[in-house]
Each structure stands twice: as structure tokens, then as C-alpha cells.
Amino acid sequence: ADPDHLDIYGTPEAYRESFEHFTSLIRPDGCLLMKQSINVTPRLQEGVKFYTYTGAFDAKELSTFNFQLSTGSPDFYAENVRIGGGEIFFDFVGPDVRIPDIQLGVPVKVNIENGVAAIALAWLNGVTPEEIKHGMATFAGPRRRFDFHLKKENIVLIDDYAHHPAELKASILSVKELYA
């Protein structure tokens, strides 16, 4: 995980330790959904279900996302990613589920990964594929995070409060891909 808010945690090690401690607080009937490439060891109580996710899971998309996957496949991932014309679509894949043609309401490439996590949690909690597709397509995101103010044929104006180097890079790359 990319340490953030080191003003609070002090060091990257303290940041990771906080996350590991947090995982120990999950109730035995709960679950943890964790990005597969995060280099921490969760301290789960017995009875906690553990799932992993990633954004896209094929060689072409993985090189684009620059994920460092651990061995084994993630439980939840995106497949058949289509980016262009200011839109992003993908197929959601998980244990015993495939939901085709998910459209992102906030078409930022990093939101493929965020979307997979949100969809996985929704799916694990009984939300139907139809509700998931509608929710993902209509979700406008938080204010000032890839917020479209103007969308015309030759002009696009986006307000994005990205403040972490990884967030800035992801936003810039997303704009380039959406409108290349």
C-alpha cells in the first residue's frame, strides 16, 4: 500500500501496522476484501472470510495498470475492459458471478479497480446485478474528484483534487486514454 497521511502515522511501517491491527478487529462473521497487491499480512480472527481483488486481470491490462500480483488469481477482477469516447466499460468477474458491461459513471481508469472493490462488496451483501450496473453507471463520485464541468466535442474541463503523486499520475493517464 502507498502510505498516505504520514503526518498522522509517522512512518510507512506505522501505517502498515495500523492496517494490520485494523484487520484484527473484524468480527468472526465478517469479511475482508483486500487489494491483491497490497504487501501487508492481515491478522484475521477465525471465521473471517478473506477475499482479494484487482482491477483488470489479463496480461495486456496488467501491464497497463502495472500491478504486482502475488501468486494465484484474485477472487474479483475486471475483464474485457473498453476505454474510449470518454467512457469506460468492463465485465466484472468473481466466484460464481460474471456481470457484463459495467459502465463507470466516473470514467477514470483507476476507478476500474475501485469499481471492482465496490461491486464485490455489493455482490457479497446480496445486491443484484441489475442494481449494481445501475449504481455504477449513475454514481457521480465525490465532488472535485474527476468532476466534469464541461464536455464538448473538442473541449473537456475536469476538476480533480488529486493530491497524492499516485493519484495525480492516475488522473493524468486516465484523461489521455479517454480522449486519445
PLM regions with names:
Residues 1-157, 177:
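Acidic, Mg2+-coordinating active-site environments of NTP-dependent enzymes
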Residues 141-144, 165-180:
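Active-site beta-alpha connecting loops in nucleotide-dependent enzymes
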Residues 157-163:
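Switch II (G3) loop of P-loop NTPases
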Residues 4, 164-165:
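Catalytic P-loop NTPase motifs of RecA-like helicase/translocase cores
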